[in-house]
Amino acid sequence: MSVNYRLGALGCLDLSSLSTSDITIDGNLYLRDLVLALQWVRDNIAQFGGDPDNVTIFGESAGAHITATLLAVPAAKGLFARAISESPAAGMVRPRELAVEFAARFADLLGARPRDAASALIRATPAQLVQTQHRLIEQGMQKRLGAFPIGPTFGDDCLPVDPVEAMRSGQSHQVPLIVGTNAEEGRLFTRFLKMLPTNKAMIDELLADAEPATRERITAAYPDYPKPSACIQLGGDFAFNAAAWQIAEAHGAHAPTYLYRYDYARGPCAGPDSVPRTPPNCSRSSTSTGPRSVRCLPLPPTGDMRCGSATT
């Protein structure tokens, strides 16, 4: 089953710092929505033939990040038995100090003075909130690549600790976890959502504050850099693969954790540095090695790549 939860500025932007003595605004509203949905499943799923003690939560990309985050939400304890996080996105969790900054920017873009921000939020239409959200995202990405304002904030009753730190210290829900990514995660983002560093200019911006030796070590890890294929790989590693590896290593120290990688073959017309115009029609499954505390999925080999439907 799937659930609806509040998105963007309506649920994923922490505006709690704009609360007043008579208007209380909670943070992490979308996580609270998901906890309520899981509680509903616990209380009602048996009526539909389900087993409330055998619930698996899973998601892809932003959904994968939410899945991993729920592992660190105290109120979600006991509401699921295992989790699958497919291509979790990095850089979406923020401390309260940064959330306060984003909230102030949001109020300013909405045209509200700080002391009137809470009432302005109540008066604003959903369309105005969404439009302001898009402006905030664009502004944040211009100021610093990867500064994405939409996502969970840690430091409140809903999410007390950064999820990866909670996993690392054993404070998260220690249920079996599958986590992994796909080959060339950054390739799709070369055509839309220019928020991933998938070209040299964006990578230079990303690494602008890094020490020269650090920049050299990072780019040296991609022998073909700055060719497009290497930039795309670096962008995918930054946004998705690094997050999956961190989650796997942290969670794997305390609970069964399985790290996977899904590979595909590009069509015969795609050159090494080209971007496919349509999804490739050849694929295969594979596993990757990970941290020693992480087990690899025992997937059987699929043999030669074959055109047509993906084989598993």
What feature does the model see in each segment?
Residues 1-115, 166-189:
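Serine-hydrolase-like catalytic core of hydrolytic proteins
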Residues 181, 209-243, 248-253, 258-264:
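Alpha/beta-hydrolase fold catalytic core
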Residues 11-19, 193-195, 276-283:
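Short, flexible, mixed-charge acidic loops at enzyme active sites
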Residues 6-13, 215-223, 283-286:
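Active-site-adjacent bridging/hinge elements
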Residues 23-28, 89-94, 163-164, 225-238, ...:
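Active-site rim elements
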Residues 43, 77, 86-205, 231-249:
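Substrate-access "cap/lid" subdomains that shape
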Residues 32-35, 39, 97-101, 173, ...:
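A structural signal for well-ordered alpha-helical segments within the folded catalytic domains
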Residues 242-245, 249-312:
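Mobile gating loops/cap/lid regions near enzyme active sites that modulate substrate access
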